[in-house]
Structure formats: structure tokens, C-alpha cells
Curated annotation (Swiss-Prot):
Source organism of this protein record: Enterococcus faecalis (strain ATCC 700802 / V583)
One Gene Ontology molecular-function label: ADP binding
GO cellular component terms, A-Z: cytosol
Subcellular location: Cytoplasm
Broad EC category: transferase
Record Pfam families: PGK (PF00162)
Gene transcribed to yield this protein: pgk
Official protein name in the record: Phosphoglycerate kinase
Catalytic function, reaction form: (2R)-3-phosphoglycerate + ATP = (2R)-3-phospho-glyceroyl phosphate + ADP
Length: 397
């Protein structure tokens, strides 16, 4: 997946459009976590240092009606960015119009501008998320070069990524996007072996396509989380009150047949009568889950089994928790697996976003992984072997 990057274009005196991912959590107008802004800094600084004018834009939350706009402005983001960069950042409170055009035309080399939430264009006919050609053309007209650095929306064809790129403007990847393509793309297309995938989370249905694609690619697939119970049921075991997708049992059976001994399931399970951190819990073999209890985590023996399967791995991709990670009594499986991956030597270790990323960060292991993906949905689709529209629209090298 050889794509042109920001280093392949001359930025001096150029108006550089940068689609960033500034979709940060806001509470009462205050940013509660600025990770995504921090993650975009290398690309933004590169534009500034190389004499370009940085015109930044992003979506923030979902906006369908006028009322939805409340609390979704990028203004607090522009203010935080200014603090992080140590220089003024101009904020333009519109997505198109004279004020925006004038502000862009008045920029000097090294200046930074942020314009309003791209999804404000969805209020009147889904122009952003429907990839309205006219809107893409308008945004493209504001710049000379387009840098797509928003991997989190790479699996969507929106006006602010695909729409702009399809006008023919030179389109390259920013540093964040480049890193995602390098790590996840490589793992799927050309992994160093042995390649072990660890999949968790609640539903088999969310991961079917990933499992199908990885059966061909991975040497082992370790399954934990709520989705494991559908596989156990497919083996003919009772799963008690555990999360179960009845309509996916036959599919789980056929996936197991296809995978053979590549697929590894939990050998023991932590069960409880209630979905509560205060309820008593104990560990049983996975083949003996009581009818009146539900599985909420993988047991100690499974943590050990998974850690053994990981020994010697050269590429590891982890997506999804092993249990109900939000409850401390049922977080041990996720923590155990996270530690086992973090302590591997000489392996490329990748977390595919979402809850697994939160777990690694919470445990202070973020620097022990080769790569923690910024895009949950996008990284899943890449693991499924799909072509992502946002990636496809970046110029090839």
C-alpha cells in the first residue's frame, strides 16, 4: 500500500488543506481528552516548519439538526491547539462563505487556521457525510495541496476526504495516516510470522469478516470476550446466561471448521449470577458454565494459555477486550492479555483501537506497543481486507 505522504510534496508558500481527526470528547464546552489533537501535532508542525499555510478541518460528533450543533463547535479545539502549538490559531465559525475565504486569503506562511465542524454541513441535506460533490469541490478550491491525516474516518467516503481528493488536487497522507497504513496494512498484507490475532468484544457479528479474512492470514486466532460464548455453543456446550448470538451459532461452527486448530477458545471462564461488580463470582471450566450464571471474563488458565500461544510471535494484532473490562472483577483477562503482549520481545504489536486501546493506556502500557490505532471502525475494516475509500483516494507513490 504505497501512498504518497506529506514528505513527497513541496509545501512552501502553499495553502495546505489538512483533514485532521479532532473528534474529541467535550463536556460543557471543555475538552476532556485532547489525545487526538496531540496526535495531529507532528503533521501540523511539519506544514508550519516547511513554510505552508495550515488550513485544518474535522468533524466533531454527529450533527443532523440545528439543535445538534450546540456544544459541537470546533472553537474549543482551536483554542487548545493554539496552547499546544504556542502560536495563534485563527478560528472561522463557518464551513463556507466570505469570512472563510477572506481568512484563508489573508494567511501568511506558517499560519494556522481551523474552520467549523464539517458535519454542520449535514443539517441541510447530509452534504458532508453524503459526499456532496459541490461541497468537496468548494473545500478543494481553498487550497493547493490536500493532506488526509484522519484515519478514523478513512472507511467513510465523505466530502471532507474523498470529495476533496476526487477533484484532482494533489492528495497525500499525513504522518498519522502513514503510520496506520504502515502498521495495520503491513500486518494484513505482509506480516512477519508467526502472526497471532487476538479478538474480543461482545459480538461475533462485529468480527465475522475479520475472522474470515484472518483465517487465511494469521497463524493463530485467540478468541475472548462475549463473542467466545457463541463459539462454545457451536461446540455443543451450554453457556448458561452468557451473551449469545443464537443466529450466529452455525456460522461460528463453519468458521471453526475452516480454521481448524488455528482458532483457540477460552478453557476456563469467570462466571457470576449477576451482571454486577458487587456480585459473587468464581471460575469454572468453559465446558461447565452453570445454567443460572453468565460468563463475564476469561479465567487464569486461559490467560496462561493465551500468553503461551503468544510466545515467539513476530506480529500481534489485538482488537477487543477479553471480558467486562469496565468492572474491576472482570478486567483481569484483558489486563493479563495486555501484559502478555506488552512484554513480548522482538514483535510488532498492534492494538486496533477502541476498548483495547483504552485498556493499554489505562494500564500505562501505551509505549510498549508498536502501534495503537486511532480508528476503531477503520482499523477493523482494514483487518477485514476491505478497501477504505479515504485511503484509496490518496495518491499512489
Amino acid at each position: 500500500m504505497a501512498k504518497k505522504t506529506i514528505k513527497d510534496v513541496d509545501l512552501k508558500d502553499k495553502k495546505v488543506l489538512v483533514r485532521v481527526d479532532f473528534n474529541v470528547p467535550l463536556k460543557d464546552g471543555v475538552i476532556t481528552n485532547d489525545n487526538r489533537i496531540v496526535a495531529a501535532l507532528p503533521t501540523i508542525k511539519y506544514v508550519i516548519e516547511n513554510g505552508g499555510k495550515a488550513i485544518l478541518f474535522s468533524h466533531l460528533g454527529r450533527v443532523k439538526t440545528e439543535e445538534d450543533k450546540a456544544g459541537k463547535s470546533l472553537k474549543p479545539v482551536a483554542e487548545r491547539l493554539s496552547e499546544l502549538l504556542g502560536q495563534p490559531v485563527t478560528f472561522v465559525p463557518e464551513t463556507r462563505g466570505k469570512e472563510l475565504e477572506d481568512a484563508v486569503n489573508n494567511m501568511k506562511d506558517g499560519d494556522v487556521l481551523v474552520f467549523e465542524n464539517t458535519r454542520f454541513e449535514d443539517v441541510d441535506g447530509k452534504k458532508e457525510s453524503g459526499n456532496d460533490a459541490e461541497l468537496g469541490k468548494y473545500w478543494a478550491s481553498l487550497g493547493d495541496v490536500f493532506v488526509n491525516d484522519a484515519f478514523g474516518t478513512a472507511h467513510r467516503a465523505h466530502a471532507s476526504n474523498v470529495g476533496i481528493a476526487s477533484t484532482g488536487i494533489p492528495t497525500v497522507a499525513g504522518f498519522l495516516m502513514e503510520k496506520e497504513i504502515k502498521f495495520i496494512g503491513e500486518a494484513v498484507e505482509n506480516p512477519k510470522r508467526p502472526f497471532v490475532a487476538i479478538l474480543g468484544g461482545a459480538k461475533v457479528s462485529d468480527k465475522i469478516a475479520v475472522i474470515e479474512n484472518l483465517i487465511e492470514k494469521a497463524d493463530k486466532i485467540l478468541i475472548g470476550g462475549g463473542m467466545a460464548y457463541t463459539f462454545m455453543k457451536a461446540q455443543g456446550y451450554s453457556v448458561g446466561l452468557s451473551l449469545l448470538e443464537e443466529d450466529k451459532v452455525d456460522l461460528a461452527k463453519s468458521l471453526m471448521e475452516k480454521a481448524g486448530d488455528k482458532l483457540v477458545l477460552p478453557v476456563d471462564t469467570v462466571v457470576s449470577k449477576e451482571f454486577s461488580n458487587d456480585a459473587p463470582f468464581h471460575t469454572v471450566p468453559s465446558t461447565e458454565i452453570p445454567d443460572d450464571e453468565e460468563g463475564l471474563d476469561i479465567g487464569e488458565k486461559t490467560i496462561e494459555l493465551f500468553a503461551n500461544e503468544l510466545q515467539g510471535a513476530k506480529t500481534v494484532v489485538w482488537n477487543g477486550p477479553m471480558g467486562v473490562f469496565e468492572m474491576s472483577n472482570f478486567a483481569k483477562g484483558t489486563i493479563g492479555v495486555c501484559e502478555a503482549i506488552a512484554n513480548l520481545e522482538d514483535a510488532t504489536t498492534i492494538i486496533g483501537g477502541g476498548d483495547s486501546a483504552a485498556a493499554a493506556i489505562q494500564l500505562g502500557y501505551e509505549n510498549k506497543f508498536s502501534h495503537i490505532s486511532t480508528g476503531g471502525g477503520a482499523s477493523l475494516e482494514l483487518l477485514e481486507g476491505k478497501t477504505l475509500p479515504g485511503l484509496a483516494s490518496i495518491n499512489d507513490k
